[in-house]
Regions:
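AAA+ P-loop NTPase domains with strong preference for DNA replication initiators
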Residues: 1-4, 35-38, 68-70, 233-327
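P-loop/Walker A NTP-binding region and its immediately flanking N-terminal helices
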Residues: 1-183, 193-199, 209-210
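Active-site catalytic pocket residues across diverse enzymes, especially alpha/beta-hydrolases
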Residues: 95, 99, 188, 270
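Conserved AAA+ ATPase "SRH/arginine-finger" region at the nucleotide-binding site
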Residues: 132-135, 216-228
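Eukaryote-skewed repeat-based solenoidal scaffolds used as protein-protein interaction platforms
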Residues: 163, 185-187, 225-234, 245, ...
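Alpha-helical scaffolding segments of alpha/beta enzyme cores, especially the outer helices
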Residues: 182-186, 264
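A short helix-turn-beta junction within AAA+ P-loop NTPase domains corresponding to the substrate/partner-engaging
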Residues: 186, 193-195, 209-223
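Conserved H-loop
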Residues: 202-203
Length: 327
């Protein structure tokens, strides 16, 4: 790439907030008058969650919770792309500061069954740690040993924004097995004096009741189609994407409320003048093959999708969405 070439910046990096100061979106009339970079210059201290575009009530609630040292354990749950991880990042910034985005790789030793030692790399900042479950029996050892070591690794209350607890963030809570969740419940009880647990999942039905009862459960809903259309239209206007209204409606309908998916599709249309990627085209062809009872083509399309690391349950779910949308 030449020095004169501009680096491509994707919409998902520009419009998914990276910090508190990013969450405020002006009204459309004012929107076009702003320079693109000035949108991210608004300060949290001079604003309030009422001015944000999505999830105003949740952010107001989190603002109040963050001001109290008796913070509860929290589970965020909602559909993919509804904004759970973004809300968690903003919440952690409310509690501490922007240094929560400075993540380093840390090594932890986890002893599994048979006294086997496993070295695990996890992301952590000065204030919190992020645990990614593996969806297997190893998860219960992972949570027990990492939290135990993390709780005693750094002395507390030595940073500028001192709190008497650290945060343990657990992603994909509903991927944990029953025994891993019971182990997590015991771990939460044991280390609740020095750690708070902030977790997210897609469905609370896969989380055991003893775990739910020990946490504040916050539902992160999908946005209405009207709000999504206005949001996407504002972005397309700001980015000077000539987007017909029927294409915009198609993007919103097929994105199932997933904010990141909407931004990726806007980017796709901006650079290629189309909104469907190769995977979505393959799904339509697969559906046609099913209707024609063509077993060989069905196997071929499924195989091609699965070797690109797309899970079978995802393929089935996306097929069902197409059927419900088009038929």
């Amino acid at each position: 790439m030449d020095d004169n070439d501009e680096k491509v910046e994707f919409l998902v990096d520009k419009y998914i907030p990276n910090s508190i100061s990013d969450i405020y979106q002006p009204e459309y009339e004012y929107y076009n008058k702003l320079d693109k970079k000035s949108i991210k210059s608004l300060d949290w201290k001079d604003s309030s969650p009422d001015k944000c575009y999505f999830h105003k009530n949740i952010l107001n609630r989190l603002k109040l919770i963050s001001e109290d040292n008796s913070l509860p354990h929290i589970i965020f749950y909602g559909n993919p792309g509804s904004g759970k991880k973004t809300l968690i990042n903003l919440f952690l910034e409310m509690i501490y500061d922007k240094s929560i985005y400075k993540l380093d790789d840390s090594k932890y030793t986890v002893i599994s069954s048979g006294n086997m030692e496993n070295e695990i790399i996890v992301k952590q900042s000065d204030y919190h740690i992020i645990i990614e479950p593996n969806n297997n029996n190893f998860d219960r050892y992972l949570i027990q040993d990492i939290v135990k070591e993390y709780a005693k690794r750094y002395p507390l209350c030595i940073y500028e924004n001192s709190r008497n607890f650290k945060i343990v963030q657990i992603n994909n809570l509903d991927n944990l097995s029953y025994y891993a969740q019971t182990s997590l419940r015991r771990t939460i009880e044991k280390y609740s004096k020095t750690c708070r647990f902030v977790m997210w999942c897609y469905s609370l039905s896969k989380v055991i009741e003893p775990l739910r009862s020990r946490c504040l459960c916050i539902h992160v809903p999908n946005q209405t189609e009207d709000d999504l259309i206005k949001w996407a239209f504002n972005i397309s206007s700001l980015e000077k994407i000539n987007l017909p209204i029927n294409i915009l409606n198609n993007i919103i309908t097929n994105s199932n409320g997933n904010l990141k998916k909407i931004l990726w599709k806007l980017d796709l249309y901006k650079f290629t003048n189309r909104v469907n990627n190769g995977y979505e085209k393959s799904l339509v062809k697969l559906l046609d093959s099913i209707r024609d009872n063509n077993i060989e083509l069905i196997r071929e399309y499924i195989y091609k999708m699965m070797i690109t690391n797309i899970e079978a349950k995802v393929i089935i779910k996306d097929l069902l969405n197409i059927i419900l949308t088009k038929y």
